[in-house]
Amino acid sequence: MESEKIIEERLKALRSTIALHDFHYYVQDAPIIPDADYDKLFRTLQQLEQQYPHLITPDSPTQRVGAPPLKVFARLTHQTPMLSLTNAFTEDEAIAFDKRIREALNVDQVNYAVEPKFDGLAVSLVYTNGILTNGATRGDGYTGEDITLNLRTIPSIPLRLQTATVTDQFEVRGEVVMLKADFEHLNEQQRNKGEKLFANPRNAAAGSLRQLDSNITAARKLTFFAYDAVLSHKDQPFFSKHSEILDYLKSQQFLVAQQNGTTTGVAGLLTYYHEMGALRLSLPYEIDGVVYKVDNLTQQETLGYVSRAPRFAIAHKFPAQEASTELLTIEIQVGRTGALTPVARLAPVFVGGVTVTNATLHNEDEVQRKQIMIGDTVIVRRAGDVIPEVVAVIPEQRPAHAQPFIMPDHCPVCGSKAARLPGEAVTRCTGGLYCPAQRKQAIWHFASRRALDIDGLGEKLIDQLIDRELVHTPADLYKLNIDTLASLERMAEKSARNLVTAIEHSKKTTLPRFIYALGIRHVGEATAKALANQASHLDQLMTLDIEQLQQIPDVGPIVAQSIIDFFSEAHNREVIRQLLDSGLQWEIPNHGVQQSEQTNSAVSGKTFVLTGTLPTMTRDQAKIKIEQQGGKVTGSVSSATSYVVAGSDPGSKYAKAIGLGISVLDEDQLLSLLQNISTGAQQ
């Protein structure tokens, strides 16, 4: 049996090894062993400590786990006050700060330490004989809340210092934040549980850190960044600069911002400010400015303090990304695809460096989830070039006259019915062929290659036609003449003549192409073909009810409802009538003959996926040949796929087909199959 001294040495070695791996994983973001090996080490430590509970030490990694809930936080007095920094909001104020420093020190230039200003919760960590013993919030700067148990759950906070300090007590200061990715993950969890979402990472970090139950804190991912240490007179001879303190903290396995640095003079300060402003959105954590500190510690002592802030440091703040203002009303904006988006009209507020009067509310569900009412005081966020959005309501400031928002059931632009399909968050205008807001998208789709295929009618030309009010619906394309088109930018008479010819040629089409060209939501090429096969006359298709539509291949309840909504809208029916009056026509296929041919084809009823580059024909040409013989072409490989036709550079679809055991054909094999008019063709 092992002696207790040997067990104690094993425990010490395990704790040291696990602490090293925690540092590599949580601080350096570069693990050096697999998770399974780490878990094995941790379980071994747990088992030994269960056998020898009297050998458990406060710095053991097992002691990070949550403790029983507290009833209230105790108060802790800071031995050295945690003072806040004076803020600078303009470059002039930063220039004035540098001038005061130079004059007070009687020097021409000053060396500064520069750091990002974290937007989190400032805390203090006290190490006694190298072991973390106390942790507290800033509080009022003199007294904070004892959150030691919660801080111990944060993996990036060392429970033991790597080397001994000169004094028995060593105090580290820094910021607890929630990384942006962890914030998104937490809010996703909150959303799935039907619980309130956090407005921003700072609120999430503060709320998580100030939990009376440290198990809740342990379950949320928090990160600690060290940015200073409180030096005693015994420590001071070992450091001459603030930047040296940060280097020491890194050596003790604290996480220190990579963007820290040093610079000289006010020009260096302002360069750093602008560099960090440009980096701000790409950083993994939120910052609300930068911090300038005189780097020389002797100079810091000379400058001293004023009131509740040091003279030797200042926070240069970025323009606020969040601000509160009154929500005056909610209007509906209709997008180019018919989406109805609620937009908040706001009392003007300066946020993110600009004056904001409008902010997106995304959709009806978001308005309800955030419990937004007209007349509320709301928090508006604008980060960089991101569209301003309302992130939260301040319910305590809700006036008695506040009104709930009701999503309209008709499009505010064209008056068509507005519908929201099952499972979708967006309400949409059903007047796709008529609605002015959807005009450009509707006409571009109508003329696209897979629809009516009007050669020469590109987006820029469509923009001109609509902006000059020459075209309002797709039917107006057939009223255009050479003289009108020749008057447009970059349209000579020859180009105009060619376009008129292309428009005229588009009148002879097929029913599947025409159905697809209408732009019915969720109706792609395959569904358009299925609809045309079921109802060879357009009038017949327009009168099918939802049950009849769902009998058609590829048409489920959502697609069926979308078709019903489209053809129920009088504006759409009028545009279709105008198109037919313009001379659009297609041959009525003889389904009996076609079915007979398809029945005898080895391709009939089979599902194909095309991938890669074929030697002698395009994938579109191959698709047409397959469909002519009753086959179906889809875009993804599944167990329902009959064949994958692979050319050169086939990609992942080929690999998936092999994995599922699906037959893979080359072009020659496909052509052979197409020529094999036999019901007994092998798969």
Swiss-Prot record:
Keywords: DNA damage, DNA repair, DNA replication, Ligase, Magnesium, Manganese, Metal-binding, NAD, Zinc. SUPFAM superfamilies: BRCT domain, DNA ligase/mRNA capping enzyme, catalytic domain, Nucleic acid-binding proteins, RuvA domain 2-like. Its EC number is 6.5.1.2. Signal peptide: none annotated. Its cofactor is Mg(2+); Mn(2+). NAD(+) binds at D35, A36, D37, Y38, D39, S84, L85, E115, R138, E175, K293, K317. GO terms for biological process: DNA repair; DNA replication. The active site is at K117. It is an enzyme of class 6 (ligase). One of its GO terms (molecular function) is DNA binding. HAMAP family: DNA_ligase_A (MF_01588). DNA ligase that catalyzes the formation of phosphodiester linkages between 5'-phosphoryl and 3'-hydroxyl groups in double-stranded DNA using NAD as a coenzyme and as the energy source for the reaction. It is essential for DNA replication and repair of damaged DNA. Belongs to the NAD-dependent DNA ligase family. LigA subfamily. This is DNA ligase. It comes from Nitrosomonas eutropha (strain DSM 101675 / C91 / Nm57).
